[in-house]
């Protein structure tokens, strides 16, 4: 990433272990953009998990019961918050609805290896590379 970002929002709504793993991305972003404001959006029940993270400036929470219209409104409100970059580390229906309302902000999305994961769990066929790691995969959108 060669661009200078001043304000970055990371989206990851669940689950607890995945949210903890995404904090490695926060560290990477702070390394490359030490002066950037880095905010995090997650489900309200997971917000306390991140509240004392030294590299996260603000935590935005979403209620698990928020429907389509509420999520669209959240996306519209993000437009008003002056972010330079939104990184979707969940790639879920919820994050796609929110991102669909975001305009004039650069968006990066983590591709999910759904087919590989399905084959691994259902048929015990591992199509992941030998050096695959979740931590490395989380960094992919930053390349």
What is each of the regions a protein language model found here?
Residues 1-143:
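Catalytic machinery of carbohydrate-active enzymes
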């Amino acid at each position: 990433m060669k661009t200078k970002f001043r304000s970055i929002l990371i989206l990851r709504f669940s689950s607890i272990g995945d949210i903890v793993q995404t904090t490695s991305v926060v560290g990477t972003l702070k390394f490359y953009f030490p002066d950037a404001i880095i905010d995090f959006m997650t489900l309200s029940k997971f917000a306390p998990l991140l509240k004392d993270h030294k590299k996260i400036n603000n935590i935005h929470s979403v209620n698990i019961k928020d429907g389509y219209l509420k999520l669209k409104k959240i996306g519209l409100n993000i437009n008003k918050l002056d972010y330079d970059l939104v990184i979707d580390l969940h790639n879920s229906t919820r994050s796609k609805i929110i991102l669909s309302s975001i305009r004039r902000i650069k968006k990066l999305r983590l591709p999910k290896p759904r087919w590989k994961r399905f084959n691994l769990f259902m048929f015990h066929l591992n199509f992941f590379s030998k050096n695959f790691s979740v931590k490395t995969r989380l960094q992919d959108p930053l390349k």
